Design a protein with these regions (language model features):
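The feature captures the LRR N-terminal capping module
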Residues: 1-85, 89-93, 99-107, 112-128, ...
């Protein structure tokens, strides 16, 4: 062999051997049948065998398909498979052959079951199955020992398999918008779970084992049918965000006061007074969002550590003078209420940087607002302001004022919208 012969030799890519040489032709025929572009699914065998990412969505194929071919299991180097907003009704058992798969996203299809072989995806880290028709999960789901994120929102699940508790590396679990009536006790075994979303199910109680989720940082419980919370909720020592909206809760357990790392809470208005009584035990609480409000109690002034207060989209017609006691408040959202005036004490909010008053019925603003020396952004859209005297501080950088009728603005030099 001459030196020239050596120069003509080219290294061949490493591929995965397969005993079935016909799989390539069948996979290409399937792709051609449904007009799947070559950019998405190459028609070159060598390229397919080293393919690491396969993304299929409506823009990449002209015809809808309900089934993935069994030959998809031959793509042994695949690390990411994304097929969302399609018409898939089932997965082939061969999906379990994708041993290197790390991400599987099947959001927005018509799946009602999963093959047991999905448990063979030992390297899977993220599984997204939201907006499907799943009524049950296979027991084998518990074999996904490396799974970190499991998204099951908007399905038809009524129960979870006990094996869900075997997902020891799971960090994010989204069960929102299903038909769950109970949770298995095994959920308490998810020791690395950081975020749990249970909103819009049919839960009336939570298992006491939920208190074992010592690494949980965010718990979302919105629009369920909860009547009580377990006292064990107070054991969630790392919880930072708690959402409690749209329930039939008559009271909060006193153990809420043990959540020493809680920074943010969103609750219905009828639970506010109880929460305020617990505030001395919640030193890190900085953000409060309230819903279904018609009045704001004077006790709100006791939340002196608050930095953000969201009172948007309620039915407030007035604010108590005590609002001015929130000396650390940086952002106040009062949009979408029925306010006609503001108390003079609003001028005492020395640290306020952002104020949203849009969508109210304000006809004037208190002169004390010129004392808000740190105010940078103010939204006055959709009110009934006839004019504003020169009372807004020079610190304002953004002023939104559209749809206020005959509004006249007397400002020194704001950066107002035009």
């Amino acid at each position: 062999m001459t030196d020239d012969d050596h120069k003509q030799l080219k290294p061949r890519p490493q591929t995965i051997a397969t005993a079935d040489d016909g799989w390539f032709e069948r996979l290409c025929a399937w792709a051609d049948k449904f007009d799947i572009s070559e950019a998405a699914l190459p028609r070159d065998k060598a390229e397919l065998l080293v393919l690491q990412k396969l993304v299929l969505f409506r823009k990449l194929f002209r015809k809808q398909f309900a089934l993935l071919p069994a030959e998809i299991g031959q793509l042994g180097n695949l690390q990411e498979l994304v097929l969302f907003w399609g018409d898939l009704t089932e997965l082939p058992a061969e999906i379990g052959q994708l041993n290197n798969l790390q991400k599987l996203d099947l959001t927005g299809n018509q799946l009602n079951t999963l093959p047991a072989t999905i448990g063979q995806l030992s390297n899977l880290q993220k599984l997204s199955l939201g907006d499907n028709q799943l009524v049950i999960l296979p027991v084998a789901i518990g074999q996904l020992g490396n799974l970190q994120e499991l998204d099951l929102w908007h399905n038809q699940l009524t129960v979870l398999p006990a094996t869900i508790g075997l997902l020891g590396n799971l960090q994010v679990l989204n069960l929102r918008e299903n038909k769950l009536t109970t949770l298995p006790a095994g959920i308490g075994q998810l020791g690395n779970l950081q975020k749990l979303s249970l909103g819009s199910n049919r839960l009336t109680t939570l298992p006491a084992e939920i208190g074992q989720l010592h690494n949980l940082q965010e718990l979302i419980l919105c629009e369920d049918q909860l009547t009580t919370l377990p006292v064990e909720i107070g054991q969630l020592g790392n919880l930072q965000k708690l959402y409690l909206l749209g329930h039939q809760l008559a009271a909060l357990p006193n153990s809420i006061g043990q959540l020493s790392n809680l920074q943010s809470i969103t609750i219905d208005s009828h639970l506010l007074l109880e929460l305020i009584d617990m505030v001395p035990h919640l030193p890190k609480l900085k953000y409060l969002s309230l819903r279904n409000l018609t009045t704001l109690p004077t006790k709100i002034g006791q939340l002196s550590n608050l930095q953000k207060l969201d009172l948007s989209d309620n039915q407030l017609t007035a604010l108590p003078d005590a609002i001015g006691q929130l000396s650390n408040l940086q952002k106040l959202d009062l949009s979408g209420n029925r306010l006609t005036t503001l108390p003079d004490t609003i001028g005492q909010l020395d640290n306020l940087q952002e104020l949203d008053l849009s969508g109210n019925k304000l006809t004037t603003l208190p002169e004390s607002m010129d004392q808000l020396r740190n105010l940078q952004i103010i939204n006055l859209r959709d009110n009934m302001l006839g004019y504003i005297l020169d009372i807004l501080p020079n610190s304002i950088q953004r002023l939104y004022h559209k749809r206020n009728g005959a509004l006249e603005i007397w400002l020194n030099d704001p950066v107002a919208e035009r």
